[in-house]
Swiss-Prot record:
The modification Phosphoserine is found at S138. It comes from Macaca fascicularis. One of its GO terms (biological process) is xenobiotic metabolic process. Transmembrane segments: none annotated. This is Sulfotransferase 1A1. GO terms for molecular function: 3'-phosphoadenosine 5'-phosphosulfate binding; aryl sulfotransferase activity; steroid sulfotransferase activity; sulfotransferase activity. It comes from the Eukaryota. Its main location: cytoplasm.
Length: 295
């Protein structure tokens, strides 16, 4: 893994005004050759919003609830991450070559950077949105452990960057709103992390209906159990512990940290919360989306 030595903490690179992890920005060129298929299914989220959770659910659905098949490889090999590229590890595009149809794909890209082929092919999308406060806290911890990001700095300075859209993948506010708008004209199932926490079974039924598949209720119950945070946290095929420590240091903060709603309250000060709420109201004005930041 000597390739990884120089990967630590490069500055973000801007592409079409969107800040990205340096290596991911470099992957966007090769990604132009990607061709979507009508039977592809895209999992789209802003980072730290339940991507791996919904990926595991969808892989289980595609494998007919067979747990053994879901253990065949780590989640990032089972669900290729389109823009993923880090020295020493197969890129998303490389993983894609070995992925049989029907394919599950993952992205965090905002619409400005999304390969047009996905929209042209009317590929179905499962989008998961999570409340901004929990995303910001989770992202801060993720920046610490995933060394492809720049240094996060203090929590206060990171929160300011998050609010300004100066973190990897840019503005949360724009991301959740533009994919919401797309859901009115494109086959997008728009889910909320908080709804999944509250009643995972109900949300899994929604996903099944959306992808046009049916499974017996006992299989769905098994899926609820197997894709619970507790189970996924200890599952090496889901928890990213198979990634080299030089890239993701779980001793700093585990990839699967708390998986709860409302954890932001342990991190935000009263002043930060008030400041955030004022800014949030401005940025989300006129948007019909409403989020729950506690359950």
């Amino acid at each position: 893994m000597e390739l990884i030595q120089d990967t630590s903490r490069p500055p973000l690179e801007y592409v079409k005004g969107v800040p990205l992890i340096k290596y991911f920005a470099e992957a966007l060129g090769p990604l132009q050759s990607f061709r979507a298929r009508p039977d592809d299914l895209l999992i789209s989220t802003y980072p730290k919003s339940g991507t791996t959770w919904v990926s595991q659910i969808l892989d289980m659905i595609y494998q007919g609830g067979d747990l053994e098949k879901c253990r065949r490889a780590p989640i990032f090999m089972r669900v290729p991450f389109l823009e993923f590229k880090v020295p020493g590890i197969p890129s998303g595009m490389e993983t894609l070559k070995d992925t049989p149809a029907p394919r599950l794909l993952k992205t965090h890209l905002p619409l400005a950077l999304l390969p047009q082929t996905l929209l042209d092919q009317k590929v179905k999308v499962v989008y998961v949105a999570r409340n901004a406060k929990d995303v910001a806290v989770s992202y801060y911890h993720f920046y610490h452990m995933a060394k492809v990001h720049p240094e996060p700095g203090t929590w206060d300075s990171f929160l300011e960057k998050f609010m300004a859209g100066e973190v990897s993948y840019g503005s949360w506010y724009q991301h959740v709103q533009e994919w919401w708008e797309l859901s009115h004209t494109h086959p997008v199932l728009y889910l909320f992390y908080e709804d999944m926490k509250e009643n995972p079974k109900r949300e899994i039924w929604k996903i099944l209906e959306f992808v046009g598949r049916s499974l017996p209720e006992e299989t769905v119950d098994l899926m609820v159990q197997h894709t619970s945070f507790k189970e996924m946290k200890k599952n090496p095929m889901a928890n990213y512990t198979t990634i080299p420590q030089e890239l993701m240091d779980h001793s700093i903060s585990p990839f699967m940290r708390k998986g709860m709603t409302g954890d932001w309250k342990t991190t935000f000060t009263v002043a930060q919360n008030e400041h955030f709420d004022v800014d949030y109201a401005e940025k989300m004005a006129g948007c019909s989306l409403s989020f729950r930041s506690e359950l």
